[in-house]
Design a protein with these regions (language model features):
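C-terminal amphipathic alpha-helix
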Residues: 117-167
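Non-transmembrane, amphipathic alpha-helical segments
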Residues: 29-43, 67-74, 106-113, 129-132, ...
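Long, amphipathic, charge-rich alpha-helical segments that form helical bundles/coiled-coils
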Residues: 81, 86-88, 92-129
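Alpha-helical segments in soluble extracytoplasmic regions
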Residues: 52-96
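Bacterial N-terminal signal peptides that target proteins for export
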Residues: 1-10
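Bacterial N-terminal signal peptides
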Residues: 9-19
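Immediate post-signal-peptide N-terminus of mature secreted/exported proteins
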Residues: 21-66
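A structural signal for well-ordered alpha-helices, especially hydrophobic packing surfaces
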Residues: 45, 49-52, 56-59, 86-89, ...
Length: 167
């Protein structure tokens, strides 16, 4: 009985703990904060940019076990944060916030434009994983700013700016 509990407790913690890493729980709770998701993506971009700088520095430094260890860690960090961006876009915005519009339905073009921008962000995040091209995280930022302009009304933009400054 005790061994089963010893095994079950960590499995439960891991299973529920992994949910924290996703963009949103996908339970139809109605609790959303789009501006916070934008800020999270911006933080992930900053982390990817820093990781790329650190990787470049470590590649040029002397080869040592410590440097190789740090190199692997920064590469993993870059990959993880690009994946977080993809997850927020796919699991939060595309799956839950951007509502499909049929042809000739009001808002159809905005839906198409938003969806195309989000897909481009996912691809730029993917390229941030695949390469050390420092323009890719910058492209994520550019595309994200374009999405903000399309997605938020003036009140939403003001809210985003207010909480961004309050960080």
């Amino acid at each position: 009985m005790k061994i089963r509990n010893i095994i079950a407790i960590p499995i439960t913690i891991i299973a529920f703990g992994l949910n924290i890493m996703t963009a949103h729980c996908q339970v139809p709770c109605g609790i959303y904060d789009d501006a916070v998701r934008i800020i999270q993506i911006r933080e992930h971009v900053t982390t990817i940019e820093k990781a790329m700088k650190q990787i470049d520095q470590l590649i040029n430094d002397e080869t040592s076990a410590q440097n190789m260890n740090q190199l692997v860690r920064w590469i993993n960090t870059k990959e993880e944060h690009a994946t977080f961006i993809q997850s927020i876009i796919a699991d939060y915005f595309l799956a839950q916030r951007i509502k499909p519009k049929q042809n000739n339905e009001p808002g159809r073009q905005q839906y198409v434009d938003q969806t195309l921008l989000l897909q481009q962000i996912i691809v730029a995040a993917m390229k941030s994983k695949q390469t050390m091209d420092k323009s890719e995280p910058g492209l994520v930022s550019i595309l994200l700013n374009q999405f903000v302009e399309l997605y938020f009304d003036e009140h939403g933009k003001n809210h985003l700016n207010t909480i961004q400054k309050g960080k």
